[in-house]
């Protein structure tokens, strides 16, 4: 990666869970509640659903790029039904979306998001959030952590831009900000994020290690792996646009 490549970056599109938020702390309890809802009172089914979604019901570890790590509510619902949930996919999707909206109140940030976004905005960067969560939950999270006024674009799986790993959310960010994909850094914690960035032709794919992915699972698809999003301050150059 060359300084020239970094110098062309003018916008940063962030994934939410595992990127802005610590994944295990924020989503471990939510995943267990999702399985409880989907089991419809069958206590023996709950751990089976968790395992089918990629979470070890004993250790709480969630596999990188698994359904629970990277899927949206509709995909998780379909997976749970395939694994034995007696609830119809459409109804379970609605129940999971409602759960994810409520859960925004309990999410745990990686850092002081308002301070970080304020510094990046002061440098002139356009900022966006693209998540497999629903848009309402993303907005509630952005409001809760004081970054809503710093964000130029928000997209969830239900926002009309398509779903990951397709390019739609990145291209929507570009339309909203007037940037070319080559001017965008995609930042995320799993390969869905990196593949979305690649499919849209972003200038930089940044993986962070605060989610379910590891350096081993992400290094092939990312341009660089960072410990967390705070390292962006040193990675990206000062940009003082008017």
Label every model-predicted segment:
Residues 1-10, 25, 40, 118-121, ...:
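Asp-based, Mg2+/Mn2+-dependent phosphohydrolase catalytic module
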Residues 6-114, 123:
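N-terminal helical cap/lid subdomain that shapes the substrate entry/recognition surface
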């Amino acid at each position: 990666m060359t300084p020239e490549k970094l110098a062309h970056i003018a916008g940063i599109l962030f994934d939410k869970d595992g990127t802005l938020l610590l994944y295990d702390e924020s989503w471990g309890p939510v995943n267990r509640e999702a399985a409880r809802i989907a089991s419809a009172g069958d206590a023996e089914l709950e751990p089976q659903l968790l395992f089918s979604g990629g979470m070890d019901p004993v250790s709480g570890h969630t596999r990188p790029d698994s359904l629970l790590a990277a899927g949206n509510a509709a995909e998780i619902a379909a997976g749970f039904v395939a694994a034995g949930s007696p609830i119809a996919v459409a109804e379970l999707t609605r129940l999971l979306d409602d759960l994810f909206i409520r859960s925004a109140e309990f999410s745990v940030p990686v850092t002081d998001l308002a301070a970080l976004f304020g510094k990046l905005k002061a440098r002139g960067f356009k900022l966006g959030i693209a998540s497999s969560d629903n848009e309402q939950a993303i907005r509630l999270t952005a409001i809760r952590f004081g970054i809503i006024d710093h964000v130029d674009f928000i997209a969830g799986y239900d926002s009309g831009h398509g779903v990951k790993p397709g390019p739609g959310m990145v291209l929507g960010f570009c339309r909203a900000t007037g940037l070319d994909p080559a001017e965008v850094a995609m930042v995320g914690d799993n390969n869905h994020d990196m593949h979305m960035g690649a499919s849209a032709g972003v200038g930089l794919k940044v993986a962070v290690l605060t989610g379910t992915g590891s350096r081993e699972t992400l290094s092939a698809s990312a341009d660089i792996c960072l410990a967390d999003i705070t390292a962006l301050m040193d990675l990206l150059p000062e940009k003082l646009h008017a």
